[in-house]
Regions:
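Active-site-adjacent structural elements that line small-molecule/cofactor binding pockets in enzymes
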Residues: 1-302
Length: 302
């Protein structure tokens, strides 16, 4: 069985962000039986975006069951102690439902420069920040001294409900897969082929020896429509606005068309070991598309 989630519209490629739509779609996802809901994270982007953990705190107040995820949280752009505090807060408010999807975010170095962070040391910074955050969330009370991150000994309160808060690492590089296998609970890429997914499954299996409890999750831009042509127009316009790149760069990694088209697209990922898929719904009427996906695509994944 594949767990299914969706991204919430905390950014908009077609006008102002509508706060009510974020909460309404979260309610929809829970009522439709989805397993988790997700929000993205960017400081500087082609369109505005809400900050992820405050947004999930609001979502926690209007849901009771679905997991709440960041997809993915840019750890390097924040102080680890403040990140740990916010993560613990959302986990407590939600009753232990948070999944911390985290990534380096190196595709946009302008975000680093705007916040005074050196993008040239992003891999080392990420490893140290993640380790420091996890130590604080576990209540270790130990100091953390790395090459970049240096924290004194202290114990944060309150601690999160979950021990540990699941950490899923975003990113396509082999180094990310290996890092996830050694120190996280999941891998959560975007824009990867089914073949790449299979290779990652093999790598994690070799390193861990046991895949049980490890999530192989796919962030998948998805558009469902009555025809493949209509869906292609919608997803290509959405991605061109949000990412400023031609659709040719994304097409092979996007699921679009009728329900049959999307089910066919997903099949090789399921075969490769995908445990979770998160529909990143592109195009108009995301709530309507979510209802169609839940009715026409999700049953084939259960």
């Amino acid at each position: 069985m594949v767990n299914v989630g969706c991204f919430l519209p905390t950014y908009s490629a077609s006008g102002p962000i509508e706060p009510a739509s974020v909460l309404d779609m979260a309610r929809d996802a829970e009522e439709l039986g989805l397993d988790h809901v997700w929000v993205g994270d960017h400081y500087l982007w082609n369109v505005g975006m809400l900050s992820p953990l405050p947004a999930l705190a609001a979502v926690a107040a209007v849901t009771r069951r679905v997991r709440l995820g960041t997809g993915v949280y840019l750890l390097n752009l924040r102080h680890p102690a403040l990140t740990a505090k916010d993560v613990a807060t959302v986990d407590v408010l939600s009753g232990g439902r948070l999944v911390l999807g985290a990534g380096i975010g190196g595709d946009n170095p302008e975000e680093y420069r705007a916040l005074g962070v050196d993008p040239g040391r992003r891999a080392r910074r990420f490893e140290e920040t993640a380790a420091a955050v996890r130590g604080l969330l576990a209540g270790s009370g130990e100091p953390y001294q790395g090459r970049i991150v240096d924290l004194p000994a202290f114990t944060m309160e309150p601690l999160p409900v979950q021990q540990p808060v699941p950490l899923w690492l975003g990113g396509r590089a082999s180094a990310v897969v290996e890092r996830a296998a050694r120190g996280a609970e999941g891998w959560f890429p975007v824009w990867v082929s089914a073949g790449r997914f299979q290779a990652a499954t093999d790598t994690v299996g070799t390193i861990r020896g046991d895949l049980s409890g490890f999530a192989f999750a796919l962030n998948l831009f998805t558009t469902i429509a009555d025809t493949r042509e209509a869906a292609r127009d919608a997803v290509s316009n959405h991605l061109a606005t949000a990412y400023g790149l031609p659709f040719d760069s994304f097409e092979r990694y996007s699921a679009y068309g009728t329900a049959d088209d999307i089910r066919e697209y997903l099949a090789p990922y399921v075969e490769a070991g995908m445990t979770d898929v998160v529909f990143n719904i592109a195009g108009p009427d995301p709530r309507g598309q979510l209802r169609r996906l839940a009715a026409e695509v999700v049953p084939a994944l259960r």
